[in-house]
Amino acid sequence: MAFTTKMQRSAVASRSSTVRVQAAGKTVSGSKTVSGGKTVGSASAESRRVAEVQAYLATLPGCGVESGPFKGVWDPLSLAATATVGDVRRWRESEITHGRVAMLAALGFVVGEQLEDFPAFFNFDGHITGQAIKQFDQVQQGFWEPLLIAIGLAESYRVSLGWATPTGTGFNNLKDEYDLGNLYFDPLGLKPEDPEELRELQTKELNNGRLAMIAIAGFVLQEVAEPGVEIFQHLFFTIEKDIVEEIDIIEKDLGLPPSFPVPTLPNLSS
């Protein structure tokens, strides 16, 4: 009984000591406590993380006023608020890659529609025609297999350059020494030696890539909304319609009969 009482007193004393330590603003680890249950140490780490991310963003091309109408970093979803530098590096690598693919896609989209009858083009003797969104299904066997191999080789090369071994802390992370987007592919020697010129060129690439991503999405949606009408057909129709409508307004003001009928958009889906 005496032993039990002694143990209870020790427990009470221990709890009292803990309360006094916590009341003094310290935990056993020595970190100061703040309101909300966080410690000063964790708050300082969070502040350092935010500062590191903001400082890193300031070094990236395409994140300043030189890249567009937005002042500083355009981040409407506040993704950078909870990100690390590693996250930002991975996002930038993704943006560069998707921008480059989109630039090729936007060019190929309109070229494929305009060169469908060109003998040297991959049109399989005229079997590939019409809207670009329909041409995917018209491609015959013998094309996709080499393309898949080429894409696999290109991606393997890109991964070997920039991505860390996907084990432990290296999973889904880029190599620290990797220069984002630099695949050492410059057959024409266009890469400038001057850092300012290089940054300007990188910003232009980013802006063109961003525009291309929006453009290719718009191309697809436009052709889905207007079946059978190719992109250039829609463009030329819009220009022609605007011109005819302006002429019609002028003729009405002058009391003249209309000279041209308002064009209608053809539907080639049938």
Swiss-Prot record:
GO terms for cellular component: chloroplast thylakoid membrane; photosystem I; photosystem II. It holds the Pfam family Chloroa_b-bind. The modification N2-acetylarginine is found at residue 48. Residues 1-47 form a transit peptide. It is a single-pass membrane protein. Chlorophyll b 4 binds at residue 158. Chlorophyll a 1 binds at residues 74, 95, 210. The chain crosses the membrane at residues 96-112. This is Chlorophyll a-b binding protein LI818, chloroplastic. It comes from Chlamydomonas moewusii (Chlamydomonas eugametos). Chlorophyll a 2 binds at residue 98. Photoregulated by reversible phosphorylation of its threonine residues. GO terms for molecular function: chlorophyll binding; metal ion binding. One of its GO terms (biological process) is photosynthesis, light harvesting.
